[in-house]
Amino acid sequence: MCSSDLFNERNLKFTSWAVGKALELNPAAGRAMAESGHEVASHGYRWINYKDFTLEQELDHIRKAFSAIEKSAGKPPVGWYTGRFGKNTLKAVVQHGGILYSSDSYNDDLPYWVKVEATPHLVIPYTLEVNDMKFAVPPGFSQGDGWLQAMTDAFDILYAEGARSPKMMSVGIHCRLAGRPSRAATLARFLDYVASKPKVWVATREQIARHWMKVHPAK
């Protein structure tokens, strides 16, 4: 099954990192996610390493990614996560405009503001700690039990700390990995565990960004 079905069945929303070229080839995917109320954010135009791209080359790919997502999902993205970013990525994202936040950062647990050429920009950090990609790279998860233990341990610590101050947990999942039957069962158990706890907000990154901008605006 596709892991998105597990979210839809529980009326939970997620952020999808969509590669622009992929949506050009399969526009129905973006449409289906948008119609289900999920956020379709950008994962770049191509699944390539951008380290050697010039600023203008990155801007060109950002424009193409925006166009592909808007045509597929019905509106342009407000979130950006290249993953294979280069030295010009953040500057290009801010110069292009229209992006509320980016996530090419792994250095904090909460959103924070940076200035890019004097322009305030919100960063919502990402994490690979409990990412299902660890099923595909060593050393990682070999069975669903290990993934479930890692997710619940991380959640429990953050939930306890959240009684004193805000906390955020990110879980990266991929249909080709977490969508496998045994792993989908693990994800379902984790979603049910999270849903059983009071005062937990399962939010898209756009929702987090808008909340942070309202409560903690750039100074």
Task: Label each PLM-derived region with a short phrase.
Residues M1-V123, L128, L148-V171, L177-K219:
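Catalytic alpha-helical scaffold of carbohydrate-active enzymes acting on polysaccharides/glycoconjugates
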Residues I124-G146:
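Positively charged, amphipathic and often flexible ligand-engagement surfaces
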Residues M133-A136, G172-R176:
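Active-site-proximal beta-alpha loop/turn segments in soluble metabolic enzymes
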